[in-house]
Structures are given as structure tokens and as C-alpha cells.
Amino acid sequence: MENVLRNDWGPLLAPEFEKEYYLTLSSFLTEEYSTHVVYPKVEDIFNALQYTSYENTKVVILGQDPYHGPNQAHGLSFSVQPGVKTPPSLLNMYKELRDEYGYEIPNNGYLVKWAEQGVLLLNTVLTVRQSEANSHKGKGWEHFTDRVIQLLNEREKPVIFILWGRHAQAKKKLITNPNHHIIESVHPSPLSARRGFFGSKPYSKVNTILANMGEREIDWEIPNL
């Protein structure tokens, strides 16, 4: 579980891979991957950071832990691999997108197009045991992903943080730089979406901020596969 980051995140996060918590986490993961089915695949664990470099991050959408069903997780929060049914929270995200922009709901949940435009799709925990939600919670990933958020907080260039639900909003304490923007609402989960996610217009809010900064707006439309 050494530093495999191939872009500017590599040197920024290099110290984390030497820290006690990470060495303990790495030993735990070696054991977990050899004795259980764990998602995502080892080579996909850091995909959020691989697809969206530090310098290119415009938006952060914070998730919790990876999907724990077969062939779903591939290292990007909320996203699933091609050929897999779109999960309920992501379907609600698409419904809000349809209401904001009129986009048709796509036939897939593969969000790489967002990541490639500077949307960091970051879970706070990067691995999970099959069928056991939160099974890798408290094992060390939170220290690592907190550091990712702190590094973005240190940046002069503004970042837009999208915090949906209490779990994501708990990270607000790490975002202290007044340059940055926070967009928050309840989670898009079917349990809460009708209590303030629907109608919150997060996608157009992001693009309004980017346009005001003179930055290229995000094309949120996910193509059919």
C-alpha cells in the first residue's frame, strides 16, 4: 500500500505513507485483501486522486465508504462501474440534475467524466469488506482523507466543497480558508432526499461560482454507455 500516486498528489501525500497510522492501515489491508473479498480492487483504491490532480481540483463531492456489492466500487465516490445498476443515491443525484438542466437520466452510474473535469469524488474511507458497510471505518483511512481535505484547504485557488448529509458536514471543521466555498444539504439518499436535497440546485450553484471565477464550468451530463 505504498505511495502509487502518479500526479502532484504524490509528493504532497508522501509523508502520510510513512506515518504510524498508515503502516498499521497497510498491514490491516494486506490481511483483509488476502482473507476476504474487499472493494474496490487494490489498483483502484486511489482512483479519485489519480483522476483529479491537486492542481486541477475545482470541486470535491465527499462520500462515505465504497459500495460493498460486486462490481460496483472503483475508487470514486457515488460512481459505479459500467454495466452495474445505478444505486439509489446516485439516481436521486441524476434526478436533481435533470430538474436543473433537463438532462436525461443516463443508463449508467460511471462518473469518470466528472472526475476528469476536476470533480474530486472522494470517500472518507477508501475500502470496504464485501456486504459489510462501514467495515473499514476507524482503521486509519479517515486520517488520510482528512489530510487530503486539509491540503486542499491550504490552497489559494478556491475549491467548492459539496457536503451532503451529516457525515460529510462533519468535515466542515477542516475547511477554514475563506477562499473556499461550501455547498451543503441533506444526503441524496432515498431516506432524506425529499427533506432538502431535491431543489437544492448544487450543480448550477457550482457552475455559477466557477463562472464568476472565470473558470470553465463543469459539464455534468453523463453520456449513455
Curated annotation (Swiss-Prot):
The active site is at residue 65. This is Uracil-DNA glycosylase. Excises uracil residues from the DNA which can arise as a result of misincorporation of dUMP residues by DNA polymerase or due to deamination of cytosine. GO terms for cellular component: cytoplasm. Its EC number is 3.2.2.27. GO terms for biological process: base-excision repair, AP site formation via deaminated base removal. The gene is ung. SUPFAM superfamilies: Uracil-DNA glycosylase-like (SSF52141). InterPro entries: UDG_fam1, Ura-DNA_Glyclase_AS, Uracil-DNA_glycosylase-like, Uracil-DNA_glycosylase-like_sf. It catalyses: Hydrolyzes single-stranded DNA or mismatched double-stranded DNA and polynucleotides, releasing free uracil. The keyword Thylakoid does not apply. GO terms for molecular function: uracil DNA N-glycosylase activity. It comes from Bacillus cereus (strain G9842). Belongs to the uracil-DNA glycosylase (UDG) superfamily. UNG family. Keywords: Cytoplasm, DNA damage, DNA repair, Hydrolase. The keyword Cell membrane does not apply. It is found in: Cytoplasm.
